[in-house]
């Protein structure tokens, strides 16, 4: 399932009738239920599942999966990632990007210095941060760079098709 994106994880069992806690990775936790079908990793393969219900419980969310009717059935699914097909995600306005689209992009300075490749992103209070794995032959001996994702000030240009991000950044940092 190459065109999928993980949007959450099944948590602990709730009750005796097969309900499971849901850890949502979406901005609005309840919006995870806007996507159907879900896919979960089961015995090394993605398996499509259907929900028969969900509800808020205390400060979290719980769901009921079709065919999962006992605590034991639910226990087998705890910790499973929840994925949806990426074409189900809403289109973003120009200049906004899903993190998954930025991971793997080459990062180059405005002066042409190859900084490395985006390996992940981190969310901070003020802005997201690109984690860039430096090239093996990095002249500054860097292994990893943390570059703030500040549009126009640091991030000068993003070309998702070419998998390239141009930044105004000192290679020594």
From Swiss-Prot:
UniProt keyword annotations, A-Z: Chaperone, Cytoplasm, Ribosome biogenesis, rRNA processing
Keyword rRNA processing recorded: yes
Lineage: superkingdom: Bacteria
Gene Ontology cellular-component terms listed: cytoplasm; ribosome
Major localisation: cytoplasm
InterPro entries, alphabetized: PRC_barrel-like_sf, PRC_RimM, RimM, RimM_N, RimM_N_sf, Transl_B-barrel_sf
GO molecular function per UniProt: ribosome binding
Purpose: An accessory protein needed during the final step in the assembly of 30S ribosomal subunit, possibly for assembly of the head region. Essential for efficient processing of 16S rRNA. May be needed both before and after RbfA during the maturation of 16S rRNA. It has affinity for free ribosomal 30S subunits but not for 70S ribosomes.
Subunit structure: Binds ribosomal protein uS19.
Domain writeup: The PRC barrel domain binds ribosomal protein uS19.
HAMAP family the record matches: Ribosome_mat_RimM
Protein name per its UniProtKB record: Ribosome maturation factor RimM
Species for this entry: Tolumonas auensis (strain DSM 9187 / NBRC 110442 / TA 4)
């Amino acid at each position: 399932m190459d065109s999928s994106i993980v949007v959450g994880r099944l948590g602990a069992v709730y009750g005796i009738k097969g309900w499971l806690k849901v850890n949502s990775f979406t901005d609005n936790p309840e919006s995870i239920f806007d996507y159907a079908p879900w896919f979960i990793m089961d015995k090394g393969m993605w398996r499509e599942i259907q929900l028969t219900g969900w509800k808020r419980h205390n400060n979290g969310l719980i769901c009921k999966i079709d065919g999962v009717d006992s605590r034991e059935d639910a226990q087998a699914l705890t910790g499973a990632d929840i994925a949806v097909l990426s074409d189900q995600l809403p289109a973003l306005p120009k200049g906004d990007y899903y993190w998954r689209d930025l991971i793997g992009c080459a990062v180059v300075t405005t002066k042409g210095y190859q900084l490395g490749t985006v390996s992940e992103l981190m969310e901070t209070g003020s802005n997201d941060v690109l984690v860039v794995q430096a090239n093996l032959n990095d002249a500054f001996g860097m292994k990893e760079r943390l570059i703030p994702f500040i549009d126009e000030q640091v991030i000068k240009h993003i070309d998702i098709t070419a998998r390239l991000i141009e930044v105004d950044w000192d290679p020594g940092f």
